[in-house]
Swiss-Prot record:
This is Putative leucine efflux protein. It comes from Shigella boydii serotype 4 (strain Sb227). It is a multi-pass membrane protein. It holds the Pfam family LysE. GO terms for cellular component: plasma membrane. Keywords: Amino-acid transport, Antiport, Cell inner membrane, Cell membrane, Membrane, Transmembrane, Transmembrane helix, Transport. It catalyses: L-leucine(in) + H(+)(out) = L-leucine(out) + H(+)(in). Belongs to the Rht family.
């Protein structure tokens, strides 16, 4: 697992909104990844990878969405309040939705799944769907374990940060800057 925007988003939400916020973000990532894996298996991801205009649309949507998320983080940091407050239940739905969109607009994930499944699934073998399902389930379980570790770690960090307001602002600012970096890298990504 290479930390990227999805990982950072889950970690940020586990720190700012507790374990519930972290797991809602993780669920958005899991569902988004499952959709991308299915698209890779169905051949749609290959079409996106080999069609420059489609790849560029996904790439720029992803970059703009990362910048949007960064602006929300920066705004909340400057205002001195948490973007996803624990007492505000409707924000939990926003966490899930943002994670899902973030996952679906990640062309690096599309490229990964296309190249990953090709290595392990023989398209000429019978029952490729079963092989795909087993491999996709394994990937999701590994992702669940990895993100659970981050969520639990984030919950512990939250206890420390609550007493250090300045540290929390610096942390949010750094996360925002990392999203800008991810957006710039995504905008310059080649298929």
């Amino acid at each position: 697992m290479v930390p990227g925007p999805n990982t950072l988003f889950v970690l940020k939400n586990s720190v700012s909104s507790g374990m519930k916020g972290g797991y809602l973000a993780a669920c958005g990532v899991f569902i988004g990844d499952a959709v991308l894996m299915f698209l890779a298996w169905a051949g749609v991801a290959t079409l996106i990878k080999t069609t420059p205009i489609l790849f560029n649309i996904v790439r720029y949507l992803g970059a703009f969405y990362l910048l949007y998320l960064e602006s929300k983080i920066l705004y909340a940091t400057l205002k001195g309040k948490n973007n996803e407050a624990k007492s505000d239940e409707p924000q939990y739905g926003a966490i899930f939705k943002r994670a899902l969109i973030l996952s679906l607009t990640n062309p690096k994930a599309i490229l990964f799944y296309v190249s990953f499944f090709v290595q392990f699934i023989d398209v000429n073998a019978p029952h490729t769907g079963i092989s795909f399902f087993i491999l996709a389930t394994t990937l999701e379980l590994v992702s669940f374990c990895y993100l659970s570790f981050l969520i639990i770690s984030g919950a512990f960090v939250t206890q420390y940060i609550r007493t250090k307001k300045k540290l929390a602002k610096v942390g949010n600012s750094l996360i925002g800057l990392m999203f800008v970096g991810f957006a710039a890298r995504l905008a310059t990504l080649q298929s």
